[in-house]
Amino acid sequence: MQRRFDAAAGTFDSADFVFATTRDGLLARLEPISIDARYIIDLGSATGSAGRSLERRFKRAHILAVDLSQEMLQKARTKKTWLSKTAFLRADATALPFSDHSIDVVFANQLLPWMPDSAPVFAEISRVLRKDGLFLFATLGPDSLRGLRHQPFADMHDVGDALLGAGLRDPVLDVDRLKVTYENTASLVDDFCAIGARHCIPDEIEEMGLEPELDLEIIYGHCWGGGQRSAGGEYRVAAGEIGLRSR
């Protein structure tokens, strides 16, 4: 995965429409939340576009842009203004180099679809997040990319269960739908290549006779640090403990 993103660093911004859409959706959901933040992780920061918005929202905070791809981080550095307090760090989302309970906000825009298992990511976020710290994320739901990929994405309730099992509390989730239409299949393939995701669509896509469009189910969520982590790999939760955001 690191090699794919390194290769895509120079083209990512030209095809980041979905990332930009969900980034704006996350920032809109962040707006009414009141939290005093000193240290914020932009987890899976890619070329750093979210960091600039987070700096405007949290003017006194230090933004820590974390990504597995050194080339993505280098691209992000070129966007940094001289007044920026953003630091750039190459690290794995499942092994963050931060002390326990030292982070106020973790912002993760479309990181989870790239992870084979969300549980280690949630566990690590739970570890570094302070009590009453905020985890805010966007990911893809199971109705995304139907007909184009074989690996299913987790549904909203599975995501909520996994958050609670990792020791994150009071999750609130909502779902949005997004359709992206292309001029032709070749344009769709070009965009997937540009963001390092060519492996997500079949090699024979141009012979499949599919419409050149993407239907995406977007899951937005936020939750808080300081919950009880489950033991023994099992967690049971009443459906009412997973909040659904009013639309």
Question: How should each PLM-predicted stretch be described?
Answer:
Residues 104-117:
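A short SAM/SAH-binding and catalytic strip from SAM-dependent methyltransferases
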Residues 174-247:
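Conserved Class I S-adenosyl-L-methionine
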Residues 18-37, 53:
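Conserved alpha-helix/loop element of class I SAM-dependent methyltransferases that forms part
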